[in-house]
Swiss-Prot record:
Pathway(s) annotated for this protein in UniProt: Carbohydrate biosynthesis; gluconeogenesis; Carbohydrate degradation; glycolysis; D-glyceraldehyde 3-phosphate and glycerone phosphate from D-glucose: step 2/4
UniProt gene name: pgi
Protein name: Glucose-6-phosphate isomerase
Root EC class: isomerase
Taxonomic lineage of the native organism: Bacteria, Bacillati, Bacillota, Clostridia, Eubacteriales
Catalytic reaction list: alpha-D-glucose 6-phosphate = beta-D-fructose 6-phosphate
Alphabetized CDD domains for the sequence: SIS_PGI_1 (cd05015), SIS_PGI_2 (cd05016)
This enzyme's EC code(s): 5.3.1.9
GO MF annotation, one: glucose-6-phosphate isomerase activity
Coiled coil regions in record: none
Family: Belongs to the GPI family.
GO cellular component: cytosol
GO biological process: gluconeogenesis; glucose 6-phosphate metabolic process; glycolytic process
Source organism: Desulfitobacterium hafniense (strain Y51)
Localization per record: Cytoplasm
Length: 533
């Protein structure tokens, strides 16, 4: 158990803020006092760069834009009066719109009060809202939230099936910054079809959250959607939770968005302090830097011991990995930076991969997230004069102790309870840590060039699929092997992709592509229409 030495170290390095309701224990990371001294100057430079960023310095040179998600919870920090007023007015419009929906002054086309929200988006545009909606859900919610966040047709059908006859009472939020994101566009078209088949007008149930002047914004204006709320070029998707992207759906659900914003604002204030030991965001980033030694490849296991925080790991996975996973640094040098984030929740994870954490490769550190308040109201005693919440804490403490005994590092974040304020604190804490770590290792945390590569390759795959279908339809009944087909459409170097596309085409009925199985399987032959005898 804890020794006198570890107790002394715990007290020396514990960050505690009673107003935030936040404790950060870094004592089980094996850094030395010399490490902290050696990082004093790099940290001072990081603080300086962050000050410039918050004042509107160009933070994303690739896209020529500022990065201002910190302004969302404190608009008066924004560098221009136009931005200040835009943030404040948008928040007021969000709250006014939510009040109109809740009061019934704004209803669906057939006089149905809106009781549900359907969010359609992808990535950062929906991970954050989904996390907070789940974390703060209660029996007092004013509306029920549903999410379409993937291009899976069956997944979309499942969501629409759960909504069922409530579709006339469902408000649909389409979230896309550019308005051209394929997954979101496809989700919107699928949902539009569902409204049409139900005899409903999609525009009478639709709200756009997008950049002004985007394709989506123009469509919403042309069709007369209920409303359009802005996204700004200085807010990236993964840091957009406290913009209209998250605040609109959360306000509609009935969540305390003022508390959410206040928690983030208050935490931001603490993470601007120049004293690293009194700055929780800096301490967190510094521990990441210590663990990775400023290099890529380390793994962060996130273990929140609270069901309400189960989706927090997925949210952090995108925030951290998309921000920090970079091939090049700001000087254009190849560095392959990144921290791999995974996890689910405790104590479930103790029965899945804890075995490897204790006895497998030592290539990770654990971030425990502890919530002190077990539930609303008293608990029943189980055994050993203990409640289920006391057992849960014991599992956390026991796992942490076992890791320490094996020489495996961990840090622990503790909050008093899960509410809107503490969720805001946690969001701001990790956003700041990401910014500071990126400055320490000299990378751009605010772009995602590799994601664009994937989108481009996906577009090429769609074009190849269309070429395959067009060729087969122009030769009805004639059978082709993969090699013959690839040669005919001049795609010989992509035979594997041709085969994969054909397997999907033959499994689904839309294009009428058939397969004559071969031996081995890749030697199958493919055709459209009845085979030529």
């Amino acid at each position: 158990m804890v020794t006198i030495t570890s107790w002394k170290r715990f007290k020396e390095y514990l960050y505690y803020d009673q107003e935030l309701g936040l404790l950060l224990d870094i004592s089980r990371m094996n850094f030395s006092a010399e490490f902290l001294r050696s990082m004093a100057e790099p940290m001072r430079e990081a603080y300086h760069q962050l000050q410039l960023l918050e004042k509107g310095a160009l933070a994303n040179p690739d896209e020529g834009r500022m990065v201002g998600h910190y302004w969302l919870r404190n608009p008066d920090l924004a560098p221009t009066e136009e931005i200040v007023q835009d943030i404040k007015e948008t928040l007021k419009e969000i709250l006014d719109f939510a009040e109109q929906i809740h009061s019934g002054r704004l209803q669906g086309e057939k006089g149905n009060p809106f009781r549900n929200i359907l969010l359609v988006g992808v990535g950062g545009s929906i991970l954050g809202p989904r996390f907070v909606a789940d974390a703060l859900a209660s029996s007092r919610d004013k509306m029920k939230a549903f999410f379409i966040d993937n291009g899976d047709p069956d997944g979309i059908d499942r969501v629409l099936s759960r909504i069922g006859e409530e579709l006339p009472a469902t408000l649909c939020l389409i979230i896309s910054k550019s308005g051209g994101t394929i997954e979101t566009r496809n989700g919107m078209l699928e949902v539009r079809r569902a409204y049409k088949e139900a005899g409903l007008s999609f525009p009478d149930h639709a709200v756009a959250i997008t950049q002004r002047g985007s394709q989506l914004d123009k469509l919403s204006q042309k069709e007369g959607w209920l409303r359009a709320f802005p996204m700004w070029d200085w807010v990236g998707g993964r840091t957009s939770l406290l913009s209209a992207v998250g605040l609109l759906s959360l306000a509609l659900q009935g969540i305390d968005v003022a508390g959410l914003l206040q928690g983030a604002k208050d935490c931001d204030g603490r993470t601007r302090r120049p004293d690293t030991l009194d700055n929780p965001g800096a301490l967190l980033a510094l521990m990441w830097y210590y663990s990775t030694q400023g290099q890529g490849g380390k793994q962060m296991v996130v273990l929140p011991y609270k069901d309400r925080l189960e989706l927090f790991t997925k949210y952090l996975q995108q925030l951290i990995m998309e921000s920090l996973g970079k091939e090049k640094n700001l000087q254009g040098e190849t560095v392959h930076q990144g921290i791999t984030v995974y996890g689910n929740k405790g104590s479930s994870d103790q029965h899945s991969y804890l075995q490897q954490l204790l006895e497998g490769p030592d290539n990770f550190f654990v971030t425990f997230i502890e919530v002190l308040k077990d539930r609303q109201g008293p608990s029943t005693y189980m055994e050993e004069n203990s409640t289920s919440g006391e057992y849960l804490q014991a599992f956390l403490l026991g796992t942490r102790e076992a890791l320490t005994q094996k020489g495996r590092e961990s840090l622990t974040i503790t909050v008093k309870e899960v509410n809107a304020y503490t969720i805001g604190v946690l969001i701001a804490l990790f956003e700041r840590a990401v910014s500071i770590y990126a400055l320490l290792v000299g990378i751009n945390a605010y772009h995602q060039p590799a994601v664009e590569m994937g989108k481009k390759a996906a577009g090429q795959a769609i074009q190849l699929k269309n070429n395959i279908v067009e060729f087969l339809k122009s030769h009805p009944g004639k059978k082709f092997s993969v090699s013959e087909l690839a040669l005919a459409i001049q795609e010989e170097e992509h035979q594997e992709m041709v085969f994969k596309l054909l397997l999907h085409l033959t499994t689904n009925p839309e294009h009428g592509v058939n397969m004559e199985p071969g031996e081995p399987w890749p030697e199958s032959r493919f055709f459209v229409g009845g085979p030529i005898s």
